[in-house]
Amino acid sequence: MSDKTKNTKPVAELSVEQVKEALIEEGKKKGILTYAKIAARLAPFTLDSDQMDEYLEHVGEAGIEVSDDADDEDPDETELVKEETESFDLTDMSVPPGVKINDPVRMYLKEIGRVDLLTADEEIALAKRIEAGDIEAKGRLAEANLRLVVSIAKRYVGRGMLFLDLIQEGNMGLMKAVEKFDFNKGFKFSTYATWWIRQAITRAIADQARTIRIPVHMVETINKLIRVQRSLLQDLGRDPSPEEIGEEMDLPTEKVREILKIAQEPVSLETPIGEEDDSHLGDFIEDQDATSPSDHAAYELLKEQLEDVLDTLTDREENVLRLRFGLDDGRTRTLEEVGRVFGVTRERIRQIEAKALRKLRHPSRSKQLKDFLE
């Protein structure tokens, strides 16, 4: 490992502000940062969406472009040092519990389990051959690390993508690592490849797995919360509370609740309900904008009573009130507008309206509407 790498301060020892500042400095030098890099560097601090948005705005104000395209963005040494702490069981090619696969996939897992793993010296030898343009060496390096892809993909099962799709996305990340690996930096290929495989899988989950797209940085946060949740479930023998999760992650309970809410998958209104599947979820959800049956019935009765009362007025009085109060179309008119309709002055309309309202206030008519006004 290079001296420069040995002197790199571990991420865990840096404060969130130090990591943010380091990203800004790096962005100023390159002129660009990717969402993937920002998400990976800030993942240990579990920022919520508002905090991340605020920081991204700060990055933009510093004149740094933030890009979605992580294809050409290499991990820095701090990120690779973090990946070195990860360990995977490359001998276990079993299928995760609850995952159904077909025979071709089972055969694939069996075959890659037979491929010999590489020693550090063999990795370097292959890397040198790749540098010299040896295509066959690329294939050998990739083939020897297909187990690594499966091991990483297992950790993302249950996040909205099929196990096979996770493996395929991880394999794409592996091929990117093969293309870009520089053995002179002192890291093992598996360390370098782990970063690229993880990036490919998490980005695919963010882009494809959910009905509502979640930013990559929030996917990382959700993944961390799920790992903590599973660990606590094993320790406690029950589902942990948001308070317990927050204590483990060093997060306020409200932030945990927010993350859990974001992590929920939307449910289709077409989801069948009942044994016969003849009803759907949408049938049982109240339309807050719709008039309730009781209110609708009361409105229809009021309309009938109002029509009866208006029929006791002269045609002109009835029509003046209909226009003034918008009884037919919901649009009220001014005295002047009604006057133009009847070809009289606004003062004459006011007099007709006043006379009509006096008639309606008479007990013989008002008692018909009294119940609706209480």
From Swiss-Prot:
Keyword field: Cytoplasm, DNA-binding, Sigma factor, Transcription, Transcription regulation
**Ranges of the DNA-binding region feature:** 335-354
A Pfam family per the record: Sigma70_r2
Q: Which GO terms describe its molecular function?
A: DNA binding; sigma factor activity
- Specify where the region named Sigma-70 factor domain-3 lies, as residue ranges: 220-296
* Locus of motif Interaction with polymerase core subunit RpoC: 165-168
Set out the biological process GO terms recorded for this chain's protein.
Answer: DNA-templated transcription initiation
Write down the SUPFAM superfamilies for this protein, in alphabetical order: Sigma2 domain of RNA polymerase sigma factors, Sigma3 and sigma4 domains of RNA polymerase sigma factors
| CC terms in the record's Gene Ontology section | cytoplasm
Entry-linked PANTHER family: RNA POLYMERASE SIGMA FACTOR RPO (PTHR30603), RNA POLYMERASE SIGMA FACTOR RPOD (PTHR30603:SF60)
Q: Which HAMAP family match?
A: Sigma70_RpoD_SigA
Enumerate the NCBIfam families for this protein: PRK09210.1, RpoD_Cterm, sigma70-ECF
Function field: Sigma factors are initiation factors that promote the attachment of RNA polymerase to specific initiation sites and are then released. This sigma factor is the primary sigma factor during exponential growth.
Subunit notes for this chain?
Answer: Interacts transiently with the RNA polymerase catalytic core.
Q: What is this protein called?
A: RNA polymerase sigma factor SigA
Lineage, broadest ranks: Bacteria, Bacillati, Bacillota, Bacilli, Bacillales
